[in-house]
């Protein structure tokens, strides 16, 4: 347990940050999974809608500091390639 006020505050901040990161990590996995599943089912319309949501969500994570800009661009790009491969 923390013995100093500043250490107690840092411990509280760590808990908050961990919960926030867990939320974004889970959300990122779920939106990516939705796009991949729609692409696997060859459902072009559903995949395009899921990609649109994923694009918006991923870039929102960049503005909140959860992802770096290059990482977000790479993820969106790979998902877009997957959706564009659907005949």
UniProtKB/Swiss-Prot annotation:
- The answer to whether UniProt assigns keyword RNA-binding to this entry is yes
Gene3D superfamilies, alphabetized: Ribosomal protein S20 (1.20.58.110)
Q: What are the entry keywords?
A: Ribonucleoprotein, Ribosomal protein, RNA-binding, rRNA-binding
Q: Name one GO molecular function term.
A: small ribosomal subunit rRNA binding
Tell me, what is an example of a GO biological process annotation in this record?
Answer: translation
Positions of region (Disordered): 1-20
A single cellular component GO annotation: small ribosomal subunit
Query: Which superkingdom does the taxonomy of this entry point to?
Result: Bacteria
What the entry lists under PANTHER family is as follows: 30S RIBOSOMAL PROTEIN S20, SMALL RIBOSOMAL SUBUNIT PROTEIN BS20C
Q: Family per UniProt?
A: Belongs to the bacterial ribosomal protein bS20 family.
According to its UniProt entry, the function of this protein is described as: Binds directly to 16S ribosomal RNA.
Q: What is this protein called?
A: Small ribosomal subunit protein bS20
What taxonomic classification does the UniProt entry list for its organism?
Bacteria, Pseudomonadati, Campylobacterota, Epsilonproteobacteria, Campylobacterales
């Amino acid at each position: 347990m923390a013995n100093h006020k500043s250490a107690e505050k840092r411990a509280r901040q760590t808990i908050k940050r961990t919960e926030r990161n867990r939320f974004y990590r889970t959300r990122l996995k779920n939106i990516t999974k939705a796009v991949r599943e729609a692409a696997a089912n060859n459902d072009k319309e559903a995949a395009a809608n899921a990609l649109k949501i994923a694009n918006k969500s991923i870039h929102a994570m960049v503005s909140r500091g959860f992802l770096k800009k290059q990482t977000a661009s790479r993820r969106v790009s790979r998902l877009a390639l997957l959706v564009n491969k659907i005949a």
